[in-house]
């Protein structure tokens, strides 16, 4: 089974390892993996629907959140926003409130941007083909193919981290200390592996297999049904042990001390959105009031730090700051893609007047 070039990432490369993968090896993988999936498939609610909106929601939530945490939130979200139209029409502040606690809140804004675009441009009907899906705002290679496969049952490869790892190990060899091929080459290989008419089970099965059996750090090679055909099986244990040894040695010498999560910008971004979500609609908070809610020992001297966080959230469309933060010079010049704690060039007294709210739209 091969896919059309129009459905591949641009210019997929080839390499000697990929050229050496034989059809018989791929057939054996297809048989072994589909047999394993038939006996071990997880009963997940987004596998009982082909509604593109529900599939898209699951994919967005699962991108950086584990299945057990996503399950109740997926149901709750659909209670609140049962259709693309409902999501498109909702105030962004409500969307962010509903997403609160899942982390990486820009996913919620992207999800609503897709909903608004599909409602405005496609009468609320999600496109089917990969090139058109790729043209939607915030939809990348993975998500476009996930919708094409999991909503429309097209035989396209869906390559997430787990799938990449499984294909690499079984067909090419150990993926440690580093992969033998790059992502584009792996996409080209993945195109050859999708069984005709079985793309849905194939991709779901690969994802399950990668998260249950062929995990990144502790693959269950001893009980793995693919062991007889797996090119990594003879050496994967040794390769992982050597990699872990190298990590330990680096940890003893010059590795930086781990930073507690509660000290990170990501933690405080979440705290800011949670504090604003608890406010009445459009009420907002000054920087100092916001700081007191997210940090017990907050002091006015920390306004520039807090303003830096707010400026980054403002730029991501997750909050509205009034007055709007000036764009940092480094970003204007294209030299730095992301500002975190760097304060915009605003005087300390001016910062006291900044009000922050969830987006009004
Ligand atoms: S034998 Fe080990 S490395 Fe190969 S697919 Fe199975 S779990 Fe993964």
Name each model feature, range by range:
Residues 1-4, 9-25, 41-42, 253:
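Short, contiguous pre-domain boundary segments
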Residues 4-7, 241-243, 249, 333:
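Acidic, low-complexity intrinsically disordered tails
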Residues 32, 36-266, 277-285, 293-303:
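Catalytic cores of DNA base-excision repair glycosylases
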Residues 147, 309-312, 355-359:
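Residues in the recognition helix of alpha-helical DNA-binding motifs
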Residues 269-273:
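Hydrophobic residues on short alpha-helical segments
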Residues 298-314:
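Short amphipathic alpha-helical interaction segments
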Residues 314-327:
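A short, conserved structural fragment
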Residues 324-361:
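Short, cationic-aromatic polyanion-contact patches
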């Amino acid at each position: 089974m091969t896919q059309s070039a129009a459905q591949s990432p641009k210019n997929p490369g080839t390499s000697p390892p990929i050229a050496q993968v034989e059809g018989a090896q791929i057939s054996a993988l297809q048989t072994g993996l589909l047999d394993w999936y038939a006996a071990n498939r997880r009963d997940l609610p987004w596998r009982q629907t082909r509604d593109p909106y529900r599939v898209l929601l699951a994919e967005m939530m699962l991108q950086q959140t584990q299945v057990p945490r996503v399950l109740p939130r997926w149901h709750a979200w659909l209670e609140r926003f049962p259709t693309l139209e409902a999501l498109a029409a909702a105030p962004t502040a409500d969307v962010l409130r509903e997403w609160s606690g899942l982390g990486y809140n820009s996913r919620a804004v992207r999800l609503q941007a897709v909903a608004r675009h599909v409602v405005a441009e496609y009468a609320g009907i999600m496109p089917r083909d990969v090139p058109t899906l790729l043209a939607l705002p915030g939809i990348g290679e993975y998500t476009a193919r996930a919708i094409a496969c999991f909503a429309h049952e097209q035989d396209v490869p869906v390559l997430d981290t787990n799938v990449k790892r499984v294909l690499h190990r079984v067909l090419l060899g150990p993926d440690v200390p580093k992969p033998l091929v790059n992502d584009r080459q792996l996409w080209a290989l993945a195109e050859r592996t999708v069984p005709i008419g079985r793309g849905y089970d194939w991709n779901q099965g690969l994802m399950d297999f990668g998260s249950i059996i062929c995990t990144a750090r502790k693959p269950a090679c001893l009980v793995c049904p693919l062991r007889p055909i797996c090119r990594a099986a003879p050496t994967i244990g040794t390769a992982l042990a050597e990699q872990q040894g190298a990590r330990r040695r680096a940890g003893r010498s010059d590795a930086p001390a781990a930073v507690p999560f509660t000290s990170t910008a990501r933690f405080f971004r979440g705290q800011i959105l949670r504090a604003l979500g608890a406010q009445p609609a459009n009420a907002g908070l000054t920087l100092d009031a916001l700081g007191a809610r997210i940090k017990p020992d907050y002091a006015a001297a920390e306004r520039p730090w807090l303003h830096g966080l707010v400026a980054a959230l403002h730029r991501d469309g997750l909050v509205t700051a009034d007055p709007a933060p000036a764009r940092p010079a480094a970003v204007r010049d294209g030299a730095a893609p992301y500002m975190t704690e760097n304060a915009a060039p605003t005087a300390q007294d001016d910062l006291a007047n900044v009000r922050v709210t969830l987006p009004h739209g």
